Amino acid sequence: MKISPEILNLVPYKPGKPISETQREYGLTTVYKLASNENPLGPSPKAMAAVKQALDHQHLYPDPSHYELLQTLSKEWGFPTKQLAIGNGSDELIDLLCRIYCEHHDGVLTSAAAFNAYEVSAPANRAVIHKVPMAEGYRFDLPAIADYFLKHPEKNIRLIFVSNPNNPTGTYATKAEVEAFLQKVGNRDDVMIIFDEAYNEFVRAKDYASAQGYMGQYKNLIVLRTFSKIYGLAGFRLGAMIAPPEVVEVFNRVRKPFNVNDLAQVAANAALQDKEFIERSQQICWKGLDYFYKKLEELGLPYIPSQGNFVMFDTLRDAAKVNEALLRRGIIMRPLLNYGFKTHLRLSVGRDHENEAAMVALAEVLKEITPL
């Protein structure tokens, strides 16, 4: 049976190495995973309390309308429910947007070294991914992305993805850059602009602004959020979308009726209201980043100041060898060869003792492996 060439050539997304796999592979008992940008505090306590109360109802199907969660989202984010949609993680939102808007050989535009999910979802939906080189400092080059779109109508670009802040680089587009970009490509009928703001809550930069503030001005603007990071609910798989009502209506037609399970809805609803946990998550992130910066500087390793809960740094060595040596010491970081970075690793913020163990192990490994 013939398989589509787009599917055959698709390079699957490779997530961070699991703790259990590392323990089995290297014969370890203690392993610290600092590879997947998870919340080191775990899930929101209020979310877990709500989940425990909901366990007795799991013989029933989940609410297909996501009513309670949408009501809370509307209250917290200030948008009517007709502009909000829920997905099985941001991955489902990205995938279905590609399915909705792209026909065979249509284009999806983003940056080099952008979140890898765009590069997976586009060909999976028979579209073609186009990537513009990053600007200096590993930043999204929004002027170049806008110019590429405007100068290449033959590419039939239907979606533009901007991850802000970006994973894995941790860099961001400023408010002024976002505004200039939207003035060039906003309010068009031939393309949707999607800002993926999974790390929005961790941003410390004063000149950053969420694209949600421009929702009323641009009819082709979509904003994505996740519950996997600041809310600590990665295992529940839940993402949210802010979009024009007509986009939400079509999305809800295409998604599976029970795309988000009941426990995920209950957990997210409670987590949104756990302000103390959100603040604690921010503080542990910022403290951890500052610690990493200090230690990386002591080790003489270049790094990129991050607006996420992770930092990308240059080992100045073959990162695959560094990563292997770290794994043997029970430290899981994230190699970035699939993003084109041969000497870089991405390091997620953990608890204090995990961060310290990671830096001790890294210092040992650097002495063993010769710089390039």
UniProtKB/Swiss-Prot annotation:
Pfam family, one: Aminotran_1_2
Cofactor: pyridoxal 5'-phosphate
Pathway assigned in UniProt: Amino-acid biosynthesis; L-histidine biosynthesis; L-histidine from 5-phospho-alpha-D-ribose 1-diphosphate: step 7/9
One Gene Ontology term from the biological process aspect of the record: L-histidine biosynthetic process
N6-(pyridoxal phosphate)lysine modification, residue list: 229
Record keywords: Amino-acid biosynthesis, Aminotransferase, Histidine biosynthesis, Pyridoxal phosphate, Transferase
GO MF entry, a single one: pyridoxal phosphate binding
E.C. number(s) listed in UniProt: 2.6.1.9
CDD domains, A to Z: AAT_like
Catalytic activity: L-histidinol phosphate + 2-oxoglutarate = 3-(imidazol-4-yl)-2-oxopropyl phosphate + L-glutamate
Similarity section: Belongs to the class-II pyridoxal-phosphate-dependent aminotransferase family. Histidinol-phosphate aminotransferase subfamily.
Oligomeric and partner information: Homodimer.
Name assigned to this protein: Histidinol-phosphate aminotransferase
Organism field: Bdellovibrio bacteriovorus (strain ATCC 15356 / DSM 50701 / NCIMB 9529 / HD100)
Lineage of source species: Bacteria, Pseudomonadati, Bdellovibrionota, Bdellovibrionia, Bdellovibrionales
